[in-house]
Regions:
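Extended, low-polarity transmembrane helix blocks
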Residues: 1-36, 44-68, 74-144
Length: 144
């Protein structure tokens, strides 16, 4: 079980790490996507950003969190915390990006499929929250 769990723990965050790298390589495009879907940013937060556009700052923050939390899970260092952050990130992605309930036709099918895929990823992340880093990790703790 320990090797299987370690392999699973390593496989789950690959999608987040790859996605984060792609976002960082095209931060302007990711910021435009966030602007287009109007992810809410409180004015109190925007006031601290100085001259940086708020959606560019949000793009860097989200891509950075996705990358760091994904790597935390891969190496098994505070994997529970990394998985918790990615659970919130994934749920927000379904709510703000894959709003299939507001769509029709091919868009409905495509975004519903993405939302269901993300639900499966949420399940895997919940298992990591339940078990933790496990063996074969930097924390080297056996599952509870």
């Amino acid at each position: 079980m320990s090797v299987a769990y370690a392999l699973g723990r390593i496989c789950v965050p690959i999608v987040f790490i790859w996605s984060a790298i792609q976002k960082l390589l095209n931060i302007g495009g990711f910021a435009k996507t966030l602007t287009d879907i109007q992810v809410p940013i409180p004015d109190e937060v925007a006031a601290y950003l100085g001259s940086m556009p708020k959606y560019v700052a949000l793009a860097y923050l989200l891509a950075g969190l996705e990358l760091i939390c994904g790597l935390m899970i891969v190496v098994g260092l505070k994997a529970r915390w990394g998985a918790l952050v990615l659970i919130v990130f994934t749920a927000a992605t379904v709510f703000y990006v894959h709003r299939f309930w507001d769509m029709e036709g091919a868009d409905y099918v495509l975004h519903q499929t993405h939302a269901l895929k993300n639900l499966s990823i949420l399940g895997a992340l919940l298992l990591i929250v339940a078990v933790g880093s496990g063996p074969h990790s930097l924390e080297r703790r056996p599952p509870e």
